[in-house]
Amino acid sequence: GTLAAAARVGFRPRLTRVTVLGDRQKSYKGKVLLVNPWIYDFAAHNLWIEPLGLLTIASVLRDNGYTVTVLDCLASHPGAPVARTDGSGRFFKTVLDKPATVAFVPRRFGRYGLPLDWFDAALAAAPRPDVILVASGMTYWYPGVIEVIKRVRARHGRVPVGLGGVYATLCTEHAQQHSGADQVIAGSGMAEALRLADDVTGNNSEPDRYADPRSWPAPAHHLVSRPFAGTVASWGCPYQCTYCASHRLQPAFVRREAGVVVDEIAGCLQRGIRDFAFYDDALLAGSGRHLAAILQGILSRALRARFHTPNGMHARGISGNLARLMRRAGVATVRLSLETLDPVRQQTTGGKVTT
């Protein structure tokens, strides 16, 4: 098929490598390989998925003089399903045997993303790193993490491997026992990722500067191949809903400056990106005033873009004025969150919606 034909003509996934230059060339500190793993599941749709945390770590490392390579298992490639005009779509799926624990599910289980041989070819083409950092998404996607670490171990031996992300934070003990990583980083990981790179290479980049999310640089969107970009207006969530792990992943609720978000979007627009997804857990917290400031900035600079809200928004935060502003600024996909129909539970979980 198309994949085989692409392989015959020597296609290999494109890797992007960047050494940071500022006002003057920064001292070379070392090479870091960042890996975004596969998804292992019964179904997976690309609703504007971008490894935002990993790309923020990439920016932190680059800003401190490291050479960064990103190997993205979810990157588009010849033979993969064609994306829709808004950037969303489907991933290439390799059907696998179902794990015993879910063997009863009447669906086809699979690995979503690059074929294994393409991953191995991309890994072989990348510069030999001093340290490897692997991201993780949903906890039950951990087989993708294990497969990535197994393959980077086979290629790079005892090069130190760090693992961060959602699975690493929520299932730390499981990750320590089963992932194969040398270090499991729980929490946001920006400072700890830089600290690990420094420890391995013998540098001191003062990683504690990145303990506060307000100090984080914009994600290095250009290091992955996507027809869209993810962004956040804020990190964390002010609510403490019992069914949600947001406060464990990011304990503090911190808003980014509206102008910084607009600058990030403008930079992506200059690279031809037109579709943007807000990843916020609480985009409309505070009656949507922060989102309104961002959208006003978009309009004042005449930026033409389309915005999507795959995480869902709290219905209570939408007013008539905000809805009209969202439409004028280009918000194209509006998803509203509904956790329960029980009025008592609606109030105890923050009153985000009423029915």
Question: Positions of the model-derived regions?
Answer:
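Extreme N-terminal basic, low-complexity initiation segments
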Residues: T2-G10
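Intrinsically disordered and other compositionally biased segments
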Residues: A6, V20-D23, A302
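Acidic, low-complexity intrinsically disordered segments
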Residues: G10-L15, L21-D275
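Short amphipathic alpha-helices and their capping/turn segments at secondary-structure boundaries
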Residues: V20-Y28, L123, I318-G330
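Radical SAM [4Fe-4S] cluster-binding motif and immediate context
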Residues: R214-T355
